[in-house]
Amino acid sequence: MGFLKGKTAIITGGGRAVLSDGSCGSIGYGIATAYAKEGANLVITGRNLQKLEDAKEELERLYGIQVLPVQADVNAGTDNEAAVANVVKQAIDTFGRIDVLINNAQASASGVSLADHTTEQFNLALYSGLYAVFYYMKACYPYLKETKGSVIN
């Protein structure tokens, strides 16, 4: 432990999802756990504040790091740049730096055939994926440049 001590990572989609068997089913939470084990402070984002709070509680308890949960939903019909700017502002206000941006979150209509996909479902996938990555990279760039940080898409 300690490779990332003093570093800050933003992880989109970092909430804690629980499967029916009680295990954790979120890729973002798995990523958050790996970074927490190495001592990084985390900013985790997602649509469900309760999942983010659950992740915060567990990660802080298990790994002695700081976690900032920020509810953020990048989708069609919202001011996405403002939502992302809010996440980045809170990260800087809380930790003073951003060393890693992990663009993990993306909503999709899993299990729906192409023939049955709606335009709304397609737009959700585009906004929560492609556009979110663009907005986060653009907003984080000045801070990542300063810390010689990294982006993981």
Language-model features and meaning:
Residues 104-110:
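Conserved NAD(P)H cofactor-binding loop of Rossmann-fold oxidoreductase domains
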Residues 137-138:
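A short, exposed helix-loop element centered on a Lys and neighboring polar residues
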Residues 2-41:
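Canonical Rossmann dinucleotide-binding motif of NAD(H)/NADP(H)-dependent dehydrogenases/reductases
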Residues 61-79:
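Rossmann-fold cofactor-recognition segment
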Residues 112-114, 118-123:
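Substrate-binding pocket helix/loop in short-chain dehydrogenase/reductase
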Residues 76-93:
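Conserved Rossmann-fold cofactor-binding substructure of NAD(P)-dependent oxidoreductases
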Residues 7, 64-66, 97-98, 144-153:
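Active-site loop of short-chain dehydrogenase/reductase
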